């Protein structure tokens, strides 16, 4: 299963298929926006071995400058199912989502476009790598995610905000 409807919080068992799906998407993105991109990495819970995750592939796209987003071929991105979420206002980040169902707003992939090796880039990569290197911490994170998914099954915003405290604590320890 890949994809979650807008606002829903659903966790599924980790799938080895997520890496293959990321690799396929990375190749597609390189043909569409590759000229402006320094690196493309999978991150988020689908990139952490052995833990449950929302079945959405988070993709980190590193660019020299966020102004490079203006050079993206938005028409080709839309043809591939990606839409720029211009209403998502996060300082230092531009967000695109791939939808397989526009009626239910079913997201399968989220592109987080950030400055390559800037703060966002380094934090996302460091957190992923730390959890993959520390299975006990990744299981603690999984437990938190399960509790929050039960608490907020239809409130993705609250789910994400409460997870942030754990992420920030880990990043501060590193």
From Swiss-Prot:
Organism of derivation: Alkalihalophilus pseudofirmus (strain ATCC BAA-2126 / JCM 17055 / OF4) (Bacillus pseudofirmus)
Family: Belongs to the UPF0157 (GrpB) family.
Gene3D superfamilies assigned to the protein according to its UniProt record, in alphabetical order: Beta Polymerase, domain 2
Protein name: Glutamate-rich protein GrpB
InterPro entries listed in its UniProt record: GrpB/CoaE, NT_sf
Upper classification of the organism: Bacteria, Bacillati, Bacillota, Bacilli, Bacillales
Entry keyword set: Plasmid
The keyword NAD is annotated on this UniProt entry: no
PANTHER family: GRPB DOMAIN PROTEIN (AFU_ORTHOLOGUE AFUA_1G01530) (PTHR34822), GRPB FAMILY PROTEIN (PTHR34822:SF1)
């Amino acid at each position: 299963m890949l994809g979650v409807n807008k606002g829903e919080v659903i966790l599924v068992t980790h799938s080895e298929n997520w890496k293959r799906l990321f690799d396929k998407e990375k190749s597609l993105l390189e043909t569409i926006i590759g000229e402006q991109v320094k690196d493309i990495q999978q991150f988020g819970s689908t990139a952490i071995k052995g833990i449950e995750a929302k079945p959405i592939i988070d993709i980190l796209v590193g660019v020299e400058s966020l102004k490079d987003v203006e050079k993206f071929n938005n028409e080709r991105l839309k043809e591939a199912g990606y839409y720029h979420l211009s209403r998502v206002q996060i300082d230092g980040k531009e967000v695109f989502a791939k939808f397989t169902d526009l009626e239910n707003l079913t997201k399968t992939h989220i592109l987080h476009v950030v400055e390559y090796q800037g703060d966002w880039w380094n934090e996302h990569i460091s957190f992923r790598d730390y959890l993959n290197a520390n299975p006990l911490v990744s299981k603690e994170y999984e437990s938190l995610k399960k509790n929050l998914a039960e608490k907020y099954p239809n409130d993705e915003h609250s789910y994400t905000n409460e997870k942030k405290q754990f992420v920030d604590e880990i990043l501060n320890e590193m």
